[in-house]
Amino acid sequence: MSNAVHETDSKNTVASKPPLDPHLKALENEAIHIFREVAAEFDNPVMLYSIGKDSSVLLHLARKAFFPGRIPFPLLHVNTGWKFKEMIEFRDNIVKEYDLDLISYTNPRGALENVTPFSHGSALYTDIMKTEALRQALDAGQFDAAFGGARRDEEASRAKERIYSFRTPDHKWDPRNQRPELWNIYNGMVRKGESVRAFPLSNWTEVDIWRYIEAENIPLVPLYYAAERPYIERDGMMILAEDERLELLPGEEIKHGSIRFRTLGCFPLTGAIRSEAATLQDVIAELEIATVSERQGRAIDRDQSGSMEKKKREGYF
């Protein structure tokens, strides 16, 4: 499957499509409302763009929210240097196709010290190259609001986070200090130095995301679809073996099989699943009978030291 961006619309228009399912239309309306509320309430918003399926849906909704104008804020990609190569190629195609303003930020300390998932382990690597890098990028841009693609159905700590997630001047999150959100009324008042992470996809499920992708013909990184690919088995995960930087451990061997990814992150820390789902319809059918979370494929979520809530308290996405 090609990495090229394919859509039925031109780069500055949204093509006519059949009416959305009422459930998806309600979710779309809510997300567009959140985008417009944040853009109206805050001085300098930014959209976090991780290149995955949720980010792709988020970007599509942002384009709709401000159509026919350009998106009135930049995209921020926290670039660890360890994303799948297909993700970076896809990102560059999307930015060019849609005429987007993209900030790609890498933690200079991490780059100088050559911090890698292999040399520093998943928890320390994530803290330096993702959490610390995100805080630095938000400070450098003086952003007072950041859109993210997190959903409540993904993971326990995200389930209790509000749509407007308030952060301290050092970007920390206190789950005990959240504001009530009545219907679609959001309180965006912040003190000097504070900021908000806004999550327009909070009420979406993984299946909602995929059904919306199908309905709106949203392009994705091909890794989400099953294909014959090389991989190794490590720590109960299937790690893609297409990057020359992959360090094989004693006894490991490269295997081949039909695999795909439910979630995408840094390639050494993201596990694939065995799958024959090579089309959107196949993926949706597969998900409708799935019994485990998509984040089971993320090594960074597996131990207490790297738990999602701990990372979020420290400023993670």
UniProtKB/Swiss-Prot annotation:
Q: Where is the composition biased (Basic and acidic residues)?
A: 1-10
**Classification via InterPro entries:** PAPS_reduct_dom, Rossmann-like_a/b/a_fold, SO4_adenylTrfase_ssu, Sulfate_adenylyltrnsfr_sub2
Tell me the GO BP annotations in alphabetical order.
hydrogen sulfide biosynthetic process; sulfate assimilation
Pathway field of the UniProt record reads: Sulfur metabolism; hydrogen sulfide biosynthesis; sulfite from sulfate: step 1/3
Recite the UniProt keywords alphabetically: ATP-binding, Nucleotide-binding, Nucleotidyltransferase, Transferase
EC no.?
Answer: 2.7.7.4
Database matches in Gene3D superfamilies: HUPs
Output the superkingdom of the source species: Bacteria
**Does the record carry Calcium as a key word?**
no
Region of interest: Disordered: 1-21, 298-317
Reaction catalysed by this chain?
Answer: sulfate + ATP + H(+) = adenosine 5'-phosphosulfate + diphosphate
The record describes the protein's role as:
With CysN forms the ATP sulfurylase (ATPS) that catalyzes the adenylation of sulfate producing adenosine 5'-phosphosulfate (APS) and diphosphate, the first enzymatic step in sulfur assimilation pathway. APS synthesis involves the formation of a high-energy phosphoric-sulfuric acid anhydride bond driven by GTP hydrolysis by CysN coupled to ATP hydrolysis by CysD.
Fetch the PANTHER family from UniProt.
SULFATE ADENYLYLTRANSFERASE SUBUNIT 2
Similarity comment: family membership: Belongs to the PAPS reductase family. CysD subfamily.
Assembly and partners? Heterodimer composed of CysD, the smaller subunit, and CysN.
Q: What is this protein called?
A: Sulfate adenylyltransferase subunit 2
